[in-house]
């Protein structure tokens, strides 16, 4: 349904945001 689609999108977005944060941290080190 629509709700599970929203949850999936949120999970993907969170994953992408987490990866971006890790990349930033790696650059700072």
Swiss-Prot record:
The keyword Secreted applies. It is found in: Secreted. Has antimicrobial activity. This is Dermaseptin-1.2TR. InterPro entries: Dermaseptin_dom. Keywords: Amidation, Amphibian defense peptide, Antimicrobial, Secreted. Belongs to the frog skin active peptide (FSAP) family. Dermaseptin subfamily. Its main location: secreted. GO terms for biological process: defense response. Disulfide bonds: none annotated. The lineage of its organism: Eukaryota, Metazoa, Chordata, Craniata, Vertebrata. GO terms for cellular component: extracellular region. Expressed by the skin glands. It comes from Phyllomedusa trinitatis (Trinidad leaf frog). The modification Valine amide is found at residue 29. The keyword Secreted applies.
């Amino acid at each position: 349904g629509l709700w599970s689609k929203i949850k999936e999108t949120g999970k993907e977005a969170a994953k992408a945001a987490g990866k971006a944060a890790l990349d930033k941290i790696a650059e700072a080190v």
